[in-house]
A protein has these predicted regions:
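A short glycine-rich, Lys/Arg-flanked "PGG" loop and its adjoining helix->strand segment in the class I
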Residues: 14-29
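A short His-aromatic
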Residues: 8-10
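A conserved beta-strand element that flanks and buttresses the S-adenosyl-L-methionine
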Residues: 2
Length: 165
């Protein structure tokens, strides 16, 4: 089974891993990349500041789960997987335009908590906070992505046999 940029949207992770385990045959592989610990950290801090000034708790609104490699390894192993490799990889990613379209798409859970007339001004405030951190010298917005990549297998059943005398 393969997953790309989806698992961090699915809750609770234990139920997701249980579903993957049930879908795989013994010996099957589970390979994925998802948001990892500190993924979009600057963006989340800026959203938290802007929403906090409006009386909203960004942490409660967040649709994401960005675990560390150690935390997700523990969940994979608890679900019965053998982890072959797991790592957190920084992956700064250039955005095709400014941060505002990214926020409107991926930050809807945050901005959608605001009344409609407040969304664009809040989005602009977030962009103002992020500009010194996420815009490079050429003027390109760079999202501070951090990915969690892993390969895990569902072990084959232990061979069962009856010893012959």
């Amino acid at each position: 089974m393969f997953s790309n940029a989806a698992l961090h949207w699915m809750h609770p992770p234990e139920a997701v891993l249980d579903g993957v385990r049930r879908a795989l045959k013994r010996g099957g592989r589970f390979v994925a990349e998802m948001g990892g610990h500190n993924n979009t950290a600057a963006i989340i801090v800026a959203l938290s500041a802007v929403l906090g000034r409006r009386g909203l708790d960004a942490h409660r609104l967040s649709p994401w789960y960005f675990p560390s490699a150690a935390a997700y390894r523990e969940k994979l192993e608890a679900a019965g997987f053998t982890v072959e490799d797991i790592r957190v990889v920084p992956r700064p990613t250039a955005l095709p335009t400014s941060i505002e379209p990214w926020l409107e798409t991926f930050g809807e859970a945050f901005l959608g908590a605001l009344p409609e007339p407040d969304r664009a001004p809040a989005c602009a405030e977030v962009a103002d906070l992020l500009r010194p951190v996420l815009v490079d010298e050429s003027g390109t917005w760079i999202a501070d992505y951090v990915r969690l990549r892993f390969r895990a297998t569902l072990p084959p059943r232990a061979a069962s046999f009856i010893a012959q005398p």
